[in-house]
């Protein structure tokens, strides 16, 4: 199949699925060649879905019922705080969340990095994950623990130090198979493709977002959105005004520790207005995608109502349960 990809021929869903199986047994050189060739060719929605389905099927099984997830492809170069992780924590005050993530590959702080900086034990095995989500509505699925099939591929990906198809696949490969999802992408070209891939994978409702260079809902301007409802996909744009929130700039973040402190400040009902508004609109999008909120303005009001003591206690409960 390598020659086919080099010749810029697209793969079917089944071919992409089988390609993942092949990669598990290939040499480092051929894995690197596949990743580079795929990156040069670009990917179709069908290819993305086929690879993601294979990743899910070869992952350690995790049956948690209907859950939500918030994730981004990363690689947008913004060095922003971990907004999708903050949104997942807030969302868990309303519904079950299985946050799938990893340490940083292309940014300063991945979801695993910031959760560890917050004090969580990120290495949660399946049985504990089930108990944790029952008790707290939240669990973290640390990708390296749940995707043993990637052991051959990940060292090559790290050595390449460039974006690959696995930046895109990570947010789709949650072994808990979330029914509800917000998925941020680092390129406008990926919005519709990823929405189609999520539809292929059977999501109930999802929002795929790109905010003028950000793989988040943009607090300073427009965000392109693909809303997935089963097989239906609607494209539209959002601005902070649609949330009833004032526009703010994105303040860069230098480390997981800084991101954790700034997130904690917002959860306490404090923090900079830039961080607060950024988290408000993204958490609202997560509430809407999960069918908790009827619209984005209601989502913001629900989030505002939980910030402060309720979210501080919620975070402490999640941390303590992860470590017990």
UniProtKB/Swiss-Prot annotation:
List residues binding anthranilate 1: 72, 102
UniProt binding sites for Mg(2+) 2: 215-216
EC number, as in UniProt? 2.4.2.18
Q: Which UniProt keywords apply?
A: Amino-acid biosynthesis, Aromatic amino acid biosynthesis, Glycosyltransferase, Magnesium, Metal-binding, Transferase, Tryptophan biosynthesis
Which GO BP terms sit in this record?
A: L-tryptophan biosynthetic process
Listed pathway(s): Amino-acid biosynthesis; L-tryptophan biosynthesis; L-tryptophan from chorismate: step 2/5
Q: Which cofactor does it need?
A: Mg(2+)
Q: Write out the GO cellular component annotations.
A: cytosol
| UniProt cross-references to PANTHER family, sorted A to Z | ANTHRANILATE PHOSPHORIBOSYLTRANSFERASE
- Give the UniProt family note: Belongs to the anthranilate phosphoribosyltransferase family.
Provide the protein name.
Anthranilate phosphoribosyltransferase
């Amino acid at each position: 199949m390598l020659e086919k990809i080099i010749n810029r021929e697209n793969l079917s869903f089944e071919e992409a699925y089988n390609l993942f199986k092949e990669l598990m047994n290939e040499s480092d050189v051929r894995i690197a060649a596949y990743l580079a060739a795929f990156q040069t060719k670009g990917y179709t929605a069908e290819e993305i879905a086929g690879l993601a389905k294979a990743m899910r099927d070869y992952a350690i099984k995790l049956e948690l019922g209907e859950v939500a997830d918030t994730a981004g492809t990363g690689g947008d170069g913004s060095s922003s705080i971990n907004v999708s992780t903050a949104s997942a924590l807030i969302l868990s005050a309303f519904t079950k969340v299985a946050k799938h993530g990893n340490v940083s590959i292309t940014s300063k702080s991945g979801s695993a990095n910031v959760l560890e900086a917050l004090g969580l034990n990120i290495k949660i095995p399946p049985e504990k994950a089930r108990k944790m989500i029952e008790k707290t509505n939240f669990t973290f699925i640390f990708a390296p623990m749940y995707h043993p099939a990637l052991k051959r591929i990940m060292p090559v990906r790290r050595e390449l130090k460039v974006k690959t198809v696995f930046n895109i696949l990570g947010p789709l490969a949650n072994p808990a198979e979330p029914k509800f999802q917000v998925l941020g992408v680092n390129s406008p070209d990926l919005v519709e493709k990823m929405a189609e891939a999520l539809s292929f994978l059977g999501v109930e409702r999802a929002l795929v977002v790109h905010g003028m260079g950000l793989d988040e809902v943009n607090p300073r301007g427009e965000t392109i959105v693909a809303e997935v409802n089963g097989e239906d996909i609607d494209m539209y744009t959002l601005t902070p005004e649609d949330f009833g929130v004032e526009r703010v700039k994105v303040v860069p973040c230098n480390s997981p520790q800084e991101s954790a402190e700034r997130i904690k400040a917002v959860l306490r009902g404090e923090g900079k207005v830039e961080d607060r508004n950024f988290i408000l609109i993204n958490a609202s999008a997560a509430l809407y995608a999960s069918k908790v909120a009827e619209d984005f303005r209601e989502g913001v009001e629900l989030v505002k109502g939980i910030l402060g003591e309720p979210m501080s206690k919620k975070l402490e409960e999640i941390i303590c349960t992860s470590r017990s």
